């Protein structure tokens, strides 16, 4: 369970805490997960991730605001997610520095990657919605 939670959150404290709370308070005791032990399984964690991705919270709102306020940040994340572009990590690049400071990206063996799967999904869905409204 802990490894799977880490796979989704990369240890981001708010996300870890939120997932654990959702598993404990909303997944456990639900129809598909009647007991607490049922909820602390792969299926229960995935259910909590779905709940988290569908809720509005201050962290996700902050992510969206930063993307809207910093066009270069928007461009970097968009290139990573939709064009599969390899972006070399360079801490002297102001856009990369800002993206890392906000926790959006991290350095993975000299390449920029989105910092965790939950952020990746939130941002992907945001850009997908933007593209739909543009067309």
Model-derived features with residue positions:
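Winged-helix-like regulatory helical subdomains adjacent to P-loop NTPase cores
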Residues: 1-102, 108
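Short, amphipathic alpha-helical interaction segments positioned at domain boundaries
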Residues: 57, 119-134
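Minor-groove-contacting beta-hairpin "wing" of winged helix-turn-helix DNA-binding domains
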Residues: 111-116
């Amino acid at each position: 369970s802990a490894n799977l939670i880490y796979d989704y959150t990369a240890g981001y404290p708010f996300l870890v805490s939120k997932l654990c709370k959702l598993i404990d308070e909303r997944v456990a005791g639900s129809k598909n997960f009647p007991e607490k032990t049922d909820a602390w399984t792969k299926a229960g964690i995935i259910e909590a991730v779905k709940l988290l991705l569908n809720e509005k919270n201050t962290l996700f709102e902050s992510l969206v605001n930063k993307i809207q306020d910093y066009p270069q940040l928007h461009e970097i994340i968009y290139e990573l997610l939709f064009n599969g572009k390899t972006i070399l990590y360079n801490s002297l690049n102001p856009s990369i520095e800002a993206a890392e400071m906000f926790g959006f990206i991290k350095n993975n063996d000299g390449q920029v990657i989105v910092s965790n799967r939950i952020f990746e999904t939130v941002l992907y869905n945001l850009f997908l919605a933007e593209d739909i409204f543009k067309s």
